[in-house]
């Protein structure tokens, strides 16, 4: 067992409580209404709610979307921090998983596509976390439009790879768990898109609920990599580097003597 097992656990343990803290701060500061509220008004002329308690009058501007919760300070500061740190962890997890699959099996388009999807998901998270929806709506929506589908694609491909690499009953059970999480993510994301284009109060509130389910589901999925990361070693990254070096040496146009000598030198350096 290696220390890398802490990374996926840390992502889940840091991000899930973090976004709930952001939500609680937004509710207490009257920036959004609580998720259990299902009553909305067209306008709120006078809200006599006491400080430190949830709003008593809510409009569509107060729907507790995750992005809305992180729009205004002070919660926006924590929201950006969670987005940036979480994105960095996601990239490291994707790189390690990519290298681990190469070490166990061989290079495949599924593995490469999963790496690209995971890194794209991280890039979208950075945009979502740093461009608040009320101040940079276009950039925020671009980030969300990139992060959510890329995250779904990553979990889909990772679930397939889990079955391809399964060698024990526990591996297959983990694959079943990941497929279940993937199905939940797919359903919640599709419903988010369907409800988002509706203008009714009920539909917009359902958007918030589906969005929360999707994000929490994806974070739990990333946490499941703790199972495989117990076997990550220094040889894991080397396997990816050696595979890349071997591929470049075998590429067309690399048959010259100087290129072959360079490739041989790289192989010797990796030993």
UniProtKB/Swiss-Prot annotation:
<feature type="transmembrane region" description="Helical">
    <location>
        <begin position="109"/>
        <end position="129"/>
    </location>
</feature>
<comment type="similarity">
    <text>Belongs to the DRAM/TMEM150 family.</text>
</comment>
<feature type="topological domain" description="Extracellular">
    <location>
        <begin position="25"/>
        <end position="75"/>
    </location>
</feature>
<feature type="topological domain" description="Extracellular">
    <location>
        <begin position="204"/>
        <end position="205"/>
    </location>
</feature>
<keyword id="KW-0472">Membrane</keyword>
<feature type="topological domain" description="Extracellular">
    <location>
        <begin position="130"/>
        <end position="140"/>
    </location>
</feature>
<feature type="transmembrane region" description="Helical">
    <location>
        <begin position="4"/>
        <end position="24"/>
    </location>
</feature>
<keyword id="KW-0812">Transmembrane</keyword>
<feature type="transmembrane region" description="Helical">
    <location>
        <begin position="141"/>
        <end position="161"/>
    </location>
</feature>
<feature type="topological domain" description="Cytoplasmic">
    <location>
        <begin position="97"/>
        <end position="108"/>
    </location>
</feature>
<feature type="topological domain" description="Cytoplasmic">
    <location>
        <begin position="162"/>
        <end position="182"/>
    </location>
</feature>
<feature type="topological domain" description="Cytoplasmic">
    <location>
        <begin position="1"/>
        <end position="3"/>
    </location>
</feature>
<feature type="transmembrane region" description="Helical">
    <location>
        <begin position="183"/>
        <end position="203"/>
    </location>
</feature>
<keyword id="KW-1133">Transmembrane helix</keyword>
<keyword id="KW-1003">Cell membrane</keyword>
<feature type="glycosylation site" description="N-linked (GlcNAc...) asparagine">
    <location>
        <position position="37"/>
    </location>
</feature>
<feature type="topological domain" description="Cytoplasmic">
    <location>
        <begin position="227"/>
        <end position="271"/>
    </location>
</feature>
<comment type="function">
    <text>Regulates localization of phosphatidylinositol 4-kinase (PI4K) to the plasma membrane.</text>
</comment>
<dbReference type="InterPro" id="IPR019402">
    <property type="entry name" value="Frag1/DRAM/Sfk1"/>
</dbReference>
<keyword id="KW-0325">Glycoprotein</keyword>
<dbReference type="GO" id="GO:0046854">
    <property type="term" value="P:phosphatidylinositol phosphate biosynthetic process"/>
</dbReference>
<dbReference type="GO" id="GO:0072659">
    <property type="term" value="P:protein localization to plasma membrane"/>
</dbReference>
<dbReference type="InterPro" id="IPR050911">
    <property type="entry name" value="DRAM/TMEM150_Autophagy_Mod"/>
</dbReference>
<feature type="transmembrane region" description="Helical">
    <location>
        <begin position="76"/>
        <end position="96"/>
    </location>
</feature>
<feature type="glycosylation site" description="N-linked (GlcNAc...) asparagine">
    <location>
        <position position="41"/>
    </location>
</feature>
<dbReference type="GO" id="GO:0005886">
    <property type="term" value="C:plasma membrane"/>
</dbReference>
<dbReference type="Pfam" id="PF10277">
    <property type="entry name" value="Frag1"/>
</dbReference>
<protein>
    <recommendedName>
        <fullName>Transmembrane protein 150A</fullName>
    </recommendedName>
</protein>
<feature type="transmembrane region" description="Helical">
    <location>
        <begin position="206"/>
        <end position="226"/>
    </location>
</feature>
């Amino acid at each position: 067992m290696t220390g890398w097992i802490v990374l996926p656990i840390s992502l889940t343990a840091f991000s899930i409580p973090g976004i709930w803290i952001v939500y609680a701060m937004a509710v207490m500061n009257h920036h959004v209404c609580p998720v259990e509220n299902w009553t909305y008004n067209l306008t709120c002329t006078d809200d006599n709610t006491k400080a430190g308690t949830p709003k008593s009058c809510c409009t569509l501007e107060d729907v507790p979307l995750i992005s809305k919760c992180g729009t205004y300070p002070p919660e926006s500061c924590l929201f950006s921090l969670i987005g940036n740190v979480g994105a960095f962890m996601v990239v490291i997890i994707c790189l390690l998983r990519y290298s681990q699959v190469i070490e166990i099996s061989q290079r495949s388009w599924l593995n490469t596509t999963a790496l690209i999807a995971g890194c794209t998901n991280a890039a979208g998270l950075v945009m979502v976390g740093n461009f608040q929806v009320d101040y940079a709506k276009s950039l925020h929506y671009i980030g969300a439009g990139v992060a959510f589908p890329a995250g779904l694609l990553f979990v889909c491909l990772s679930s397939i790879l889990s079955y391809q690499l399964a060698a024990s009953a526990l591996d297959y059970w983990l694959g079943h768990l990941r497929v279940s999480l993937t199905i939940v993510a797919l359903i919640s994301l599709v419903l988010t898109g369907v409800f988002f284009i509706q203008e009714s109060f009920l539909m917009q509130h359902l958007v918030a609920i589906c969005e929360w389910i999707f994000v929490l589901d994806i974070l739990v999925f990333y946490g499941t990599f703790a199972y495989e990361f117990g076997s990550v070693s220094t040889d894991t990254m080397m396997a990816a580097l050696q595979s890349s070096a071997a591929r470049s040496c075998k590429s067309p146009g690399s048959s010259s003597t100087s290129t072959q000598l360079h490739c041989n030198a790289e192989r010797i350096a990796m030993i």
